[in-house]
Amino acid sequence: MIITLVGCQTNKTSQANNTFLKYKSAVEYGLQDEGITKDDIIDEIQVGGEQFIIFANPNLSDSIAIANINVDKNGAYTWNLVGSRCAFAMSSNHSIPSVKDEIQTISRKKFNFYLGPDKTKLALMADVDNEELKYDEKRELYYIIREI
């Protein structure tokens, strides 16, 4: 399968008004708010003390987005969209792009999110070994989040 970037839409980092006592409740709220299910979650990753959920939204051209589950000083959890939504589509175009998106969490930590179909190109772009990249088999995309 050959994939080409269709487009990315910037999301403002949105702090949810709803806080929850449990991590699971914040995730369930976020899934419901996005109109998606647990099956749409690509991965849950912890990097630099922050929890991220990478997910696809089939209602929005299977766009890939990231949420940060923030824990405040009182131990309450919130679902917050961070970064851009990137949509990929199948194409016969042989110019296959990769995406680098700088994201910032509610706690003001900065990260780079790398996403693309070519493992070698993405590893070079992210300055990591090929083995460090994660892979989404369903969408045939490699990805990694790195703290800046």
Could you describe each region identified by the protein language model?
Residues 4-7:
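C-terminal motif of bacterial Sec signal peptides marking the signal peptidase cleavage site
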Residues 9-71, 75-80:
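N-terminal export/targeting and maturation segments
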Residues 63-148:
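Extracytoplasmic electrostatic interaction patches
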